[in-house]
Amino acid sequence: MGVMKRYMQFVKPYKKQIFVTVLIGIVKFSIPLALPLLLKYVVDDIIQGGGTASDKTTSLFTIMAIMFALFLILRPPVEYYRQYFAQWTASKVLYDIRAKLFDHIQKLSLRFYANTRTGEVISRVINDVEQTKDFVITGLMNIWLDMLTILIVISIMLTLDVKLTLISIVLFPLYGISVKYFYGRLRKLTRERSQALAQVQGHLHERIQGMPVIRSFAIEDHEQAQFNEKNGHFLDKAIRHTNWNAKTFAVVNTITDLAPLIVIACAGYFVINGPLTVGTMVAFVGYIDRMYNPVRRLINSSTTLTQSIASMDRVFEFIDEPYELTDKPNAIKADQIRGGVEFQNVSFQYEKDKENILHDVSLKVNRGETVALVGMSGGGKSTLVSLIPRFYDVTSGRLLIDGTDIRDYEARSLRNQVGMVLQDTFLFSETIRENIAIGKPDATLEEIIEAAKAANAHEFIMSFPEGYETRVGERGVKLSGGQKQRISIARVFLKNPPLLILDEATSALDLESEHYIQEAMDKLAKDRTTFVVAHRLSTITHADKIVVMENGTIIEIGTHDELMDYESQYKHLFTIQNLN
């Protein structure tokens, strides 16, 4: 019941629309309830009543004309508005939930995404949220209408014959027993099926992104076997769910089909041996159908609601994923950052109870300085710079910006003061203009063009027929590595932050692209505090400080000339690269 109560918080803003939908539904379901009474009247009062054949025919066509008019005038608009309001309300609720989830997604730590498959996150936001739609339409609307229909039908039947009415509802307790027995396990099976589907989606999403690797290594058969294993696991869970669901329907529908047989037998006996009229018997059989159809729908609704609640469990399990990084209640805005950065005895680990990646790192960087971080792969360079925009909090020690611990700043305002150009540039499948504007969403086209020119990107952008409106494809697949990198640099020019991080931004590029990008980065770094993670040491000889890292610690600090004056690790690396 806890998840249903939480779900109702999303439904609450639309309670008026739900109330109107239920009222319209009452009218919709009430209209057909007149048909058995009409049938009784036709049988008892017209067909078996007194009068000539002509009088009976006139009475029959008169009453039928009235009923035709009633159905033609009322039924279409009632049916339309009930369906429209029900679907509109459910869609709005799902819109709000997905908006909440996306807001939540943007606040989760990078550690969460490192440990969670993208496809599984997508499954929660799309599939599981969609499954909860039935709770709104079925649980909050149809169930009440079906229950009200049953009560109205029983009330009408009681006016016709009390004894036969009691016989009609004698099987009701069996429904309650069936629901209690079947639906507890059904919720568990539904949850397992949803989890298996999320695994398939996660696997599929990853393989689609890695299709060039699959093709280049010719491992299609291996990957097909891997997918078949995941898909087979989902199939197994789906069949187990279907098997249990089928048992539920078998029992429920058998009970539903027995009820009319019992009523027909008893009603026939009462007509033969008692005062019950043929018309009343016919009406009763008609009402049995109108009573047990809602009962059947209620049981089916239990299945639907069980599946919806299982999906709610997964949705709220995701919403309850804690934030690793939260702002202090009195956090200050980082609007006036000057650019001084200091690491004070900083240690860091990605996972608790795991070995530290950084060990007691201390480093002071003055405003406007360019600091290069060099060393062998795995030394902790990228980890160190990832602490500056507070993607992670330090495990111990302090990281200060302008003398203030970064945990005292609002994280979002702090990140707004940091520009990053990474080796693996991510572009969205939108236009070049929109991708550059990520640096400043409200930027004018003129500002975007100026940023592109500064990044040496304007010329190649204008070589495309659609210029800045060229769509770059998923992850920028239509652009070369150098072109994507220049778009990334243009973003930072547009953002114009006081702090800059360049993480291996020129690695794996051809010489021409590297020349354009290095020139753009030199312009970008001017008058900014800049951290450069580099493997090509020839690109950072101008740095104010060169920091050599090894196994998560700083082993050397100095300028290029200072470090080349003795047998330093830096000199060793620089000499090897120049020899190559």
UniProtKB/Swiss-Prot annotation:
Listed GO MF terms: ABC-type transporter activity; ATP binding; ATP hydrolysis activity; ATPase-coupled transmembrane transporter activity
EC code(s) of this entry: 7.6.2.-
Domain ABC transporter, first and last residues per copy: 341-576
Main location, first listed in the record: membrane
Family membership noted in the UniProt record: Belongs to the ABC transporter superfamily.
Oligomer and partners: Homodimer.
Function noted in UniProt: May be involved in multidrug export. Transmembrane domains (TMD) form a pore in the cell membrane and the ATP-binding domain (NBD) is responsible for energy generation.
Protein name: Putative multidrug export ATP-binding/permease protein YgaD
Source organism (scientific name): Bacillus subtilis (strain 168)
Gene from which this protein is expressed: ygaD
